[in-house]
Amino acid sequence: MATSRLNASCRFPASRRLDCESYVSLRAKTVTIRYVRTIAAPRRHLVRRANEDQTLVVNVVAAAGEKPERRYPREPNGFVEEMRFVVMKIHPRDQVKEGKSDSNDLVSTWNFTIEGYLKFLVDSKLVFETLERIINESAIQAYAGLKNTGLERAENLSRDLEWFKEQGYEIPESMVPGKAYSQYLKNIAEKDPPAFICHFYNINFAHSAGGRMIGTKVAEKILDNKELEFYKWDGQLSELLQNVSEELNKVAELWTREEKNHCLEETEKSFKFYWEIFRYLLS
């Protein structure tokens, strides 16, 4: 017996400039992820109880003895690959390789300022502090394996801001974008772990890729090639990212398909929030 195929659909502009900005997980394009409902897996129920004796009907195709088709992009490779699939719809694969991008030439035309960069660093510090505090203090099991991953940035940012202060620069207070993102993370952390995990993934993995490329350009233009602590990690970054990916996959294994889809759909919000902070670099 046939069933409907589940497909992911993402819509976004095709402009080269927008591709560059979204590559660093900053420009908030509208991304809509839809999965067609099926008899066996409706939008809000992964499986249905067939009767009172708790028999599970998982898939009509399987019930008919046929091999079920794969329904979600990258699902066999783990949930992190599903998240990457959604992000890659916004910035192509060939632009996300160790912080390098064909967009380098475009970024080189941006006019960075110390004042704008400090605002960016201050708000980024607030977001990372919030993210790390939630993970360290929460009793939610899904966050337990995300402590002390080596990706933490708040302490590094504190050292960077202290360096700027020693150079005679005035450090600004946190601005509205940083405060808004911080508060949103606090609001969803306890009641919506899948959504929070989406932000954790996008914040850390975007900074490890596009964020490093931006940091290099800023250093070249206005910091006399000074490499900030924000862009340094203890150990091999690739190994740190791999360890976190494995942990996120373990967390997602306990989720229903509904919860996984909800996590993927949160990607748009993470882009919107971080874009507001990134705009300081362009002002």
Curated annotation (Swiss-Prot):
Keywords: Chloroplast, Heme, Iron, Metal-binding, Oxidoreductase, Photosynthesis, Plastid, Transit peptide
Listed EC numbers: 1.14.14.18
One record GO biological process: heme oxidation
Description of pH dependence: Optimum pH is 7.2.
Domain of life: Eukaryota
Principal place of residence: plastid
MF-aspect GO terms: heme binding; heme oxygenase (decyclizing) activity; metal ion binding; mRNA binding
Reaction equation(s) it catalyzes: heme b + 3 reduced [NADPH--hemoprotein reductase] + 3 O2 = biliverdin IXalpha + CO + Fe(2+) + 3 oxidized [NADPH--hemoprotein reductase] + 3 H2O + H(+)
GO CC aspect terms: chloroplast
UniProt subcellular location: Plastid, Chloroplast
Record protein name field: Heme oxygenase 4, chloroplastic
Species whose genome carries this gene: Arabidopsis thaliana
Gene, per the UniProt record: HO4
